[in-house]
From Swiss-Prot:
Entry keyword Cytoplasm: yes
Subunit field text: Monomer.
Gene: tuf2
Function of the molecule: GTP hydrolase that promotes the GTP-dependent binding of aminoacyl-tRNA to the A-site of ribosomes during protein biosynthesis.
Protein name (Swiss-Prot/TrEMBL): Elongation factor Tu 2
Residues covered by region (G3): 81-84
EC assignment: 3.6.5.3
Disulfide bonds: none
Broad class of the protein's primary localization: cytoplasm
Superkingdom of source: Bacteria
Length: 396
């Protein structure tokens, strides 16, 4: 039978496997592709294919990530799997591979381990909307009571990080048995059950075009007789000619009206997410707008200076700092299109942050930036990236 073409008409969702080292994340990823390939929903990949994850760069940081894609009856998925713990930390903090949901893999033989906890915390900090659990390696556990105990531990751990531990679906099985074609109850059927759960439990993300309009300002020009044009790539939503927009960040919020949208020197009646456009603003002077601000739907985003960040600090080998930093460290924070100086305060009981650490930091910027939870940024010193972070919580 000829293999069916990957249809792009199904809703798309980005997911990934997370969990402790050697609990079976990559084996599960391979098992999903192998089982779904039987119904034409994937190209089968073995463990070695996925484990040889290529290097990629995100915000100046090198990360190893494997990408596979597959589809169920309802959705098309892009799935990320990382070979090492440090890659997970970097991936989740930089948002290199966006996750709309994640499969937490826990070995039934070991139960939750330190990285299980750390990945759940990271998922919470970076705003992964939903998790499901695959309890792997049940073929190694004979005692039903032990499985119940592990399930209870996992649920308590999830609840302690504000995930709905009592409600999160847990699928029990063995990814290795599924790959080897062993007992279908814990093998193939568990993989199909997991995918049904992922389909049902991980909410369909909003498409960028359906979100409120936002465009980071990259450049500002003044066109005689027409007014001021700001250029940039629309990040989300749609802007239509005649609509009110706000200019947010760096200075006081200003309201103005979009009187024209142009792309490739052609006039359009609207611009949408993904478009590189020039937006003509009525009555706005060239000196009223600057790179680093955003154009947005009025009231949809506000400027802030104080926030809690989850950040990863590069190692010396990654081109980062050679020495630790202490409280009151003042680097630049690169948000969208511009650098803003900020002051970092370390948490109580934390003496210093070493290169290679990931940590929660309290940050205060010297000028306000349009931000919401989940916004990514780079930490820089004199134009060189020394870290990456995400806004975990806005303070003021």
């Amino acid at each position: 039978m000829a293999k069916e073409k990957f249809e792009r008409n199904k809703p798309h969702c980005n997911i990934g496997t997370i969990g402790h080292v050697d609990h079976g994340k990559t084996t599960l990823t391979a098992a999903i592709t192998i089982i779904l390939a039987k119904s034409g929903g994937a190209t089968a990949k073995n463990y070695a294919d996925i484990d040889a994850a290529p290097e990629e760069k995100a915000r100046g940081i090198t990360i190893n990530t494997a990408h596979v894609e597959y589809e169920t009856a309802n959705r098309h998925y892009a799935h990320v799997d990382c070979p090492g713990h440090a890659d997970y930390v970097k991936n989740m903090i930089t948002g290199a591979a966006q996750m709309d949901g994640a499969i937490l893999v826990v070995s039934a033989a070991d139960g939750p381990m330190p990285q299980t906890r750390e990945h759940i915390l990271l998922a919470r900090q970076v705003g992964v909307p939903a998790l499901v659990v695959y309890m792997n390696k049940v073929d190694l556990v004979d005692d039903e009571e032990l499985l119940e105990l592990v399930e209870m531990e996992v649920r308590e751990l999830l609840s302690s990080y504000d995930f709905p531990g009592d409600d999160i679906p847990i699928t029990k099985g063995s990814a290795k048995v599924a790959i080897d074609g062993g007992d279908p109850v814990i093998g193939e059927q568990s993989i199909l059950a997991l995918m049904t759960t992922v389909d049902a439990y991980i909410p369909q993300p909003d498409r960028p075009i359906d979100l409120p309009f936002l465009m980071p300002v990259e450049d500002v020009f003044s066109i005689s007789g027409r007014g001021t044009v700001v250029t940039g790539r629309i990040e989300k939503g749609v802007v239509k000619v005649g609509e009110e927009v706000e200019i947010v960040g760096i200075r006081a919020v200003q309201k103005t009206t979009c009187t024209g949208v142009e792309m490739f020197r052609k006039l359009l009646d609207q611009g949408q997410a993904g478009d590189n456009v020039g937006v003509l603003l009525r009555g706005t002077k060239r000196e009223d707008v600057e790179r680093g601000q955003v154009l947005c739907k009025p009231g949809s985003i506000t400027p802030h200076t104080k926030f809690v960040a989850e950040a990863y600090i590069l190692t010396k080998e990654e081109g980062g700092r050679h020495t630790p930093f202490f409280t009151n460290y003042r680097p630049q924070f690169y948000f969208r299109t511009t650098d803003v100086t900020g002051i970092i305060k370390l948490r109580e009981g934390v003496e210093m942050i070493m290169p290679g650490d990931n940590a929660e930091l309290d940050v205060e910027l010297i000028t306000p930036i349009a931000m919401d939870q989940g916004l990514r940024f780079a930490i820089r010193e004199g134009g060189r990236t020394v870290g990456a972070g995400v806004v975990a919580k806005i303070v003021e």
